[in-house]
Amino acid sequence: QSPKDAYPYDISELVKDAYPYDISELVK
């Protein structure tokens, strides 16, 4: 089973849902 099967949505979209701010800004 590929990760895409387990997570059919885009992981980046999931991150945006969890962290509505830009991750690059968080890293700064």
From Swiss-Prot:
E.C. number(s) listed in UniProt: 3.1.-.-
Stated name of the protein: Putative GDSL-motif lipase/hydrolase-like protein
Entry keyword annotation includes Transcription regulation: no
Coiled-coil intervals, chain numbering: none
Family from the record: Belongs to the 'GDSL' lipolytic enzyme family.
Record-level Gene Ontology MF annotations: hydrolase activity
Entry superkingdom: Eukaryota
Alphabetical UniProt keywords: Hydrolase
Organism (species): Populus euphratica
Protein's UniProt keywords contain Hydrolase: yes
